[in-house]
Amino acid sequence: MTLRLQNTLTGKKDDFIPLDPNRITLYVCGPTVYNFVHIGNARPVVVFDVLYRLLQRLYPNVVYARNITDIDDKIIKAAADNGEAISTLTERFTQAFADDMASLNAKTPSIIPKATDHIPEMIQMIAILVEKGHAYEADGQVLFAVESMPDYGKLSGRKLEDMLAGARVEVADYKRHPGDFILWKPSTDEQPGWDSPWGRGRPGWHIECSAMIHKHLGDVIDIHGGGQDLIFPHHENEIAQGCCAHGTDYVRYWLHNGYINIDGEKMSKSLGNFRLVRDLLTQYHGETLRFALLSSHYRSPLNFSADVLDNAEKGLDTLYYALLGRGETVAPEAGYQLPDNHPVLDALKDDLNTSEAVSALHAIAGELNKAELDDKPKLKAELLAAADLLGLLTVEPTAWFQNKNVSEDGLSNDAIDALVEERTQAKKDKNFARADEIRQQLTKAGIQLEDTREGTRWSR
């Protein structure tokens, strides 16, 4: 099956045809490091980590860059409020971000470029845009002239005259068009700044990604990812800068993940309804958070709640219990390779359908639970290899069930619930042999079942 991705630029699911099959290029917008990241910031990291893993499975060389924005007005304000140096603040929160994402089992990208390490490249790119007539100086600033690009707005599908409503666009008298955006801004003596042909100043937000992509990945790249909220103006402006500076296309496939909602509202710092990743990690294992983020399609909104997290933990308990087995010691088959037509691979090749991939994991776990002893090594290896594409099942099963309310046989409450649900379904399917097997298994573990009209109750 061919890898197919929903391309925001074309508005449809496109076959992925790389520029160079021997060097796949992927760029994802990273954090602005002035605070700890919330779970909404983590969603694109986890989503595109799955894409990175999939691309590594399909191609010999994948170059993945995810930037760090370490110069921004929010950073300047936060450092001033805290009474600390900007570099101290950004280094602290850069490390905190790395630690949090490691807890979610996100792979480290090939390249992690920092904005402040690329000021010369930004200045050079701005100079090219000025020279080509796509940018101009005004009121001490350098701005991109959106009217100089005939197809400006092609990513968001907005017309120039309509795109200001509801967008993060500053309207000012010194602009030729209200949609013109800042490439370079002046700095006061108290603010960080760098010397440039337009005076001492600092870059605008949008130019950072374009300059870093050009340096590390090239004029045109395969895939650019980020949150849905970045489509306009950030990614629209990236396209304008990249295309106009280099006279080429910029990105061939644009991918955007959906919002995370809390109680039906988009989670955001402005609404005060955000949940920090590190706070959630005090209550849940990082793999539980990851599983929850992958429980729905990446382009769909995800209503984040305690129920979603509890269901994620139960789902993982079911998978880990299949690996744990029933007391037998079974090692995964050595050297197992996931076949190219495996259901998990096929699901991910279909625009990263992680929910379908997770369902396929549960199907393997179900087979593993029913398998004869001789068949278990291969099934266990298959489950681990398939889960690795999703960044899941990285903990030893016995360790997973530690620090939970578990029976002497290693069964947590959630694992027991999962087995009871499986037994109920087996009875509905008239698979009475499996239903009896589960009852016997739970009885051996000291769990008593009581079938009632309301359902099955269990007790230790």
Curated annotation (Swiss-Prot):
Q: Among the entry's GO cellular component annotations, what is one?
A: cytosol
Q: What is its main location?
A: cytoplasm
Q: What does the record list as GO biological process? A: cysteinyl-tRNA aminoacylation
Protein location: Cytoplasm
**Substrates-to-products reaction catalysed:** tRNA(Cys) + L-cysteine + ATP = L-cysteinyl-tRNA(Cys) + AMP + diphosphate
Which top EC class is named for this enzyme in its record?
Answer: ligase
| Keywords linked to the UniProt accession | Aminoacyl-tRNA synthetase, ATP-binding, Cytoplasm, Ligase, Metal-binding, Nucleotide-binding, Protein biosynthesis, Zinc
Q: Which cofactor does it need?
A: Zn(2+)
| Chain sites annotated for binding ATP | 269
Residue positions binding Zn(2+) = 29, 209, 234, 238
What parts of the sequence cross the membrane? none
Q: Where is this motif: 'KMSKS' region?
A: 266-270
For this protein, the record's SUPFAM superfamilies field holds:
Anticodon-binding domain of a subclass of class I aminoacyl-tRNA synthetases (SSF47323), Nucleotidylyl transferase (SSF52374)
**Name of the protein in its database record:** Cysteine--tRNA ligase
Q: Which organism is it from?
A: Alcanivorax borkumensis (strain ATCC 700651 / DSM 11573 / NCIMB 13689 / SK2)
What taxonomic ancestry is recorded?
Bacteria, Pseudomonadati, Pseudomonadota, Gammaproteobacteria, Oceanospirillales
Q: Which gene encodes it?
A: cysS
